[in-house]
A protein has these predicted regions:
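Conserved phosphate-binding catalytic cores of ATP/NTP-utilizing and phosphoryl-transfer enzymes
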Residues: 87-112, 320-356
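Conserved phosphate-binding loops in N-terminal lobes of ATP-dependent enzymes
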Residues: 1-57, 156-294
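Glycine-rich phosphate-binding loop and adjoining helix at the ATP-binding site
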Residues: 288, 292-341
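Charged, amphipathic alpha-helical linker segments immediately N-terminal to NTP-binding catalytic cores
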Residues: 38-84, 298-299, 316-320, 324-328
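Short secondary-structure boundary/capping segments
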Residues: 132-136, 142-144, 299-309, 347-351
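Flexible phosphate/Mg2+-sensing switch loops adjacent to catalytic phosphate-binding sites
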Residues: 133-161
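Phosphate/oxyanion-binding active-site loops and adjacent basic polyanion-contact surfaces
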Residues: 80-91, 253-271, 294-302, 333-340
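Gly/Thr-rich phosphate-binding beta-strand-loop-beta motif of the actin/hexokinase/Hsp70
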Residues: 107-137, 345-359
Length: 359
């Protein structure tokens, strides 16, 4: 992670100071003229400098790619990292500090009090949030966030594409908050569906893509099991039925190798990474809608999976501040018909006369 990378660079910095002194003496002595006979001495002097350059490059890429690598959100610029009023949530350790020119930012400064609405659909999911009084929709898994926006972009396909299962699980089951997943190991939403549609004759690719995750959630333990296989190794994984795994209110989520692979939790995490993007702020309250006839036990399982996935999209330094973890909530707020009516009635110039009749 970023902290470990910088700890390594502290050691390299010490070697670097010594090497620059030796390099200065070496150049003054004229010994460099003996190259290649003095190749060993040259390499000995330059090795820490080369290592430092590589470490700086790796650290820079790690930090600028923090959002792009897992969710293909735009890369961070050096200006964002070094801005006194910007910086990184990931580096926050309880007080302001600057690490190699990068500012640590308290994520609590970016918490938004406004709720996020999620319509988790069978084929697609719609996410809406309040941006300083302006209601906006979100796009998830699009190839280019800077491309012209289309209305269809907001219908986010409820799909996951498994490219490298072992690599995915190694990270997902070892890091609870903001695990550094790689988009090249697991893709979501628009890009996953685009790959499926453009390669419909490819059985290997088709078996790696899980469509209509909401339908999978309806399966019971006695139903036919769903299997997926990844694209890299052909690893076959049988998905267990969705179970009720609610995080404990106010407690940090723990993960481990025995955790089941839950597509609903994974999908919710992707949504959360976009919802809680640096440009949008951090959100603690989420409202979901469900079909009227959806079984109560299935709703509870989906809500639990979304609680886990959305909470895991928050920065660890934020949930470490327990007051914010206590405020985190994912609730069922309305049925889909009621939510639709609430949106449509103002447009039609209608007002409810009895509150109970529309909720």
């Amino acid at each position: 992670d970023a902290e470990a990378m910088y700890a390594n660079m502290d050691d390299i910095n010490e070697q670097l100071k010594k090497s620059f002194g030796r390099l200065h003496d070496w150049l003054l002595s004229g010994d460099y003229l003996l190259y290649p006979a003095d190749k060993t001495a040259k390499e000995d002097v330059l090795a820490p400098i080369i290592a430092y350059g590589k470490a700086c490059s790796a650290a820079s890429a790690l930090l600028t790619d923090l959002d792009w690598r897992p969710a293909r959100l735009p890369k961070l610029s050096p200006a964002q990292l070094q801005d006194l009023h910007g910086g990184l949530w990931e580096l926050w350790r309880g007080e302001p500090e600057v690490v190699d020119g990068v500012h640590a930012r308290n994520p609590a400064l970016d918490v938004r009090d406004r709720p996020v609405a999620i319509d988790f659909g069978t084929s697609s999911t719609v996410v809406a949030y309040d941006d300083h009084g302006s209601k906006k929709l979100l796009r998830v898994g699009v190839r280019d966030f800077d491309a012209p926006i289309r209305a269809a972009d907001f219908e986010n396909p409820t799909a996951l594409e498994f490219v490298d299962l072992p690599a995915l699980l190694a990270v997902w089951q070892s890091e609870a908050y903001r695990p550094m997943l790689n988009w090249d190991d697991l893709r979501c939403a628009h890009e996953a569906l685009d790959h499926y549609r453009s390669n419909e004759g490819d059985a290997t690719l088709a078996s790696s893509i899980l469509l209509k995750i909401k339908q999978w959630a309806l399966r019971e333990a006695h139903d036919h099991r769903v299997c997926i296989s990844d694209q890299i190794l052909g690893t076959v994984h049988t998905l267990p039925p969705l179970t009720l795994r609610n995080p404990v209110k106010g407690a940090l989520i723990q993960v481990g190798a025995d955790d089941p692979l839950d597509p609903v939790e994974l999908y919710a995490w992707f949504l959360g990474m976009v919802i809680n993007w640096r440009r949008h702020g951090l959100h603690l309250k989420y409202y979901m809608s469900f079909p009227v006839d959806y079984p109560r036990e299935v709703k509870d399982k989906i809500l639990a999976a979304f609680r886990r996935g959305l909470q895991r999209s928050l920065p660890a330094p934020l949930v470490a501040q327990r007051e914010y973890l206590e405020r985190f909530a994912v609730e069922e707020r309305a049925s889909e018909p009621a939510a639709y009516a609430a949106c449509a009635m103002p447009t039609l110039g209608l007002s409810p006369t009895d509150r109970k009749s529309v909720v």
